[in-house]
Amino acid sequence: MVKELLRNHSSVRIYDGNPISKEIIEELIATAQMAATSHFVQAYSVIWVTDEEKKEKLGMLSGNPRQYETSGGAFVFCVDFKRLQSAGKLEGVDIVADSAENVLVGVADVSLFAQNFVVAAESMGYGICYIGGVRNKPEEISELFNLPEYVFPLFGLTIGVPARRNEVKPRLPVAAVLHENEYNTEKYEELLPAYNDTMEAYYNNRSSNRKIDNWTKQMADFLIEQRRPHIKDFLAKKGFNWK
């Protein structure tokens, strides 16, 4: 049953607008906390946005206003080393937070934590959508939610009862992501064109927003230029100087 749940995931962008109770939200957070965490640092915090004005501003800043408007719960998932700084002070030491390694640890911790939250939510019949758009305006979002030094927003997330469900989007074939004993680049020459055929058929036949497109073209268009070049300077301002 768990495998079936995971394989049927699709992002939900329009919800029925009914709020999810605090009891359920806290249950989902407690479940999320049981995810694996590097060296038990638990380098995550979540902003639950219940203030309608803040929710509206978040939607505008991240470029997803309708998702936030109709959702039953709106969140910003953050990498958090501020709490670890407080832990160090209790022990009379200054922790070294500003390292590239700690950024990676925080990103991994938040991602695992969030995915536990998502799977638990979907098991209860809710839909979700991750929102990377919070990194478009990270300084403004940090100010909106009073995020201190050593805390930065990684992604947003909406949850709610779906008003409409999307079809499951085909993933890359297993052979494209599973490498035995050593990395194999040559297989992409065969696998990627075949995957393009799969994605072209999906886009042409899905129930809404049909288009002519394929995966390699999407990725080429997406990665042809540097994305969010402001992030490095933003992280430095937050105390992460990539030592």
Curated annotation (Swiss-Prot):
SUPFAM superfamilies (alphabetical): FMN-dependent nitroreductase-like (SSF55469)
Keyword ATP-binding on entry: no
Keyword Oxidoreductase: yes
Obligatory cofactor(s): FMN
Keywords assigned: Flavoprotein, FMN, Oxidoreductase
Enzyme Commission no: 1.-.-.-
InterPro entries on file: Flavin_OxRdtase_Frp, Nitroreductase, Nitroreductase-like
Coiled coil spans: none
GO MF annotation list: oxidoreductase activity
NCBIfam families with a match to the protein in the record: PRK10765.1
Annotated family: Belongs to the flavin oxidoreductase frp family.
Record protein name field: CR(VI) reductase
UniProt source species: Pseudomonas sp. (strain G-1)
